Amino acid sequence: VMYMLISMELNDDHSEKVRYDYPDYPIYIRKGLLSHYPNYTAPNHWHDALEFIFVFSGAMNYNINGHIVLIQTGEGIIVNSGQMHFGFSRTKSECEFICVLLHPILLCGSYAFERDYILPVIQNTAMPYMLLTPQTPWHNLCLNFIRAFYENKDSAIAPLKITADFAALWTILFENMPKSPSEKLPQNRDLTIIKNMTGFIHKNYAKKMTLSDIARAGAIGQSKCCKLF
């Protein structure tokens, strides 16, 4: 198996500059090893694409907006659009996994379709992520699709096959996701604050920074800044 050394480039706001696999299709698919990251820890980052992880062997801790879950062999996770996240191993143990990033624009055929079927998923504040276990039938279908994304990545018609499977997975997710507390809830403001502050740190890491400077970048007090970090 060829493992790609995973290098991650971040923008000032801590969003990832995703290097997609196809010039015209926002699709990124890799098989990786956690040991390829410094200290078995990926950088904390976010992106508009949804992230899909399937663990082939070993296990991985995963931090989503400060919530830590354990993904074991045969399990996976879907991380929703715009969430701060990273994978790591507390014990520096090896983990072999598939990582897939798919941008929802792949499914946005029209404004009505985006409004009715895409936005209700990516704006669902009750679903920052979905841990997938094979014991739950609909989770198992999603896990099969994540493996299929990887298996189809070298096909002559890979973007077509992957987008078709993405639409099928999206349908399952749409039908089974937890209900959002409100149709029009704004994005979690704390996440916006964290993005602003991490962006400030990223931009000014070579300079001397105080807690006050970082808090000011998030337009919050120093005690709230400490609590968020």
Indicate where each model-derived feature is located:
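Short, Lys/Arg-enriched, Trp-marked, Pro/Gly-tolerant hinge/linker segments that flank
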Residues: 126-139, 152-218
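Short, Lys/Arg-enriched alpha-helical recognition elements, typified by the DNA-recognition helix
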Residues: 143-146, 197
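Helix-turn-helix DNA-binding motif, specifically the short coil turn and the N-cap/start of the second
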Residues: 221
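Short hydrophobic/aromatic patch on the recognition helix
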Residues: 74, 224-229
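Ligand-binding loop in jelly-roll beta-barrel domains
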Residues: 82-107, 112-113
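Acidic/polar active-site rim loop that often engages polyanionic ligands
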Residues: 100, 121-127
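Generic protein-terminus/edge-of-domain signal
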Residues: 1-76, 83, 91, 115-116, ...
